[in-house]
């Protein structure tokens, strides 16, 4: 497992715990957020081999564009962006990052 993959595992696991316990989201909502985050993670690691801490705004924009080009509904695009933004907001709140690439 690469360093980037390890960081994705660590931070996505912490994020899952956060949205499940501290935010108290319903199980279906947690699963939807995690599914969207896995989709984003797959895009980032397959194309760029980046850890979540190395992602910059153009990568997020390219990911959203890929959803559009794949014919994803606008509601799917918005929900996915919301999930990715929530993940990066979590990293900001926990002082892991200073700036979100999903702003």
Kindly label every feature range from the protein language model.
Residues 2, 13-28, 34-103:
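N-terminal core-binding DNA-recognition domain of tyrosine recombinases/integrases
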Residues 1-8:
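N-terminal leader/domain-start detector
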């Amino acid at each position: 497992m690469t360093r980037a993959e390890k960081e994705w595992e660590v931070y996505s696991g912490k994020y899952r715990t956060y949205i499940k316990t501290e935010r108290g989201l319903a199980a279906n909502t947690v699963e939807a957020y995690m599914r969207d985050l896995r989709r984003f993670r797959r895009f980032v690691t397959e194309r760029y081999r980046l850890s979540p801490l190395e992602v910059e705004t153009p990568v997020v924009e390219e990911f959203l564009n890929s959803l559009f080009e794949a014919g994803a509904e606008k509601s799917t695009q918005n929900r996915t962006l919301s999930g990715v933004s929530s993940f990066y907001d979590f990293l900001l709140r926990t002082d892991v990052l200073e700036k979100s690439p999903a702003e």
